[in-house]
A protein has these predicted regions:
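Alpha-helical membrane segments of multi-pass proteins
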Residues: 1-183
Length: 183
């Protein structure tokens, strides 16, 4: 299920933002200054990064995690409350809008690095724990030779792997685009 979350966050969200025609976004925001200011605040790198990190981390608290596994409606809310903040998180890197533009190349490098660091506390809890923190997985029948603890660590590695690859690709793109512009 971690792979599903990673695809929502690091593949779907950037594709949605990149695929939004700037004329549509800018035309919609043209006569809506309050909405534009509100969205400018929410898509600011600090706000978007923090909102995403807090929402994503919150769903990994054992009580919320377990509740989402037991309730289909709550699971849908979980996905939306990861996906929509992911849109805010990636907006500064991928926006084509002139009213809510992407950040500059140098800032994109720093922001992407910050995103790599932001999920370290969650990742550390999942990977360095000596026992599984999620009851459902601890009690579930094993479908592979992985123990529940090893399965949790594998999920954390998948999570961090997607985060690192995403951030490094964004940093690399920003660096080389910046270099090309300065040539």
């Amino acid at each position: 299920h971690m792979l599903q979350h990673m695809l929502l966050i690091y593949v779907s969200a950037p594709l949605i933002v990149t695929g939004l025609p700037p004329e549509l976004v800018d035309g919609f925001l043209k006569d809506r200054p309050r909405l534009t200011r509100g969205l400018a605040f929410l898509t600011h790198p600090v706000a978007g990064g923090l909102i995403f990190t807090l929402c994503f981390s919150m769903w990994h608290f054992p009580e919320l995690y377990e509740a989402a596994l037991r309730s289909r409606p709550l699971h849908v809310i979980e996905h939306w409350s990861m996906f929509l903040p992911a849109i805010l998180m990636v907006w500064p890197l991928f926006s084509l809008s002139t009213r809510l533009p992407r950040i500059g190349y140098g800032m994109a490098i720093f922001y992407s690095f910050g995103l790599m660091i932001a999920d370290l506390p969650l990742w550390a809890v999942l990977i360095f724990g000596d026992h599984p923190i999620y009851e459902t997985y601890r009690l579930a029948p094993r479908v592979s030779e992985l123990s529940a603890a090893a399965d949790m660590i594998l999920g954390a590695v998948v999570m961090k792997g997607f985060n690192e690859i995403f951030a490094l690709l964004c940093m690399g793109y920003a660096f080389f685009a910046w270099y090309q512009r300065e040539k």
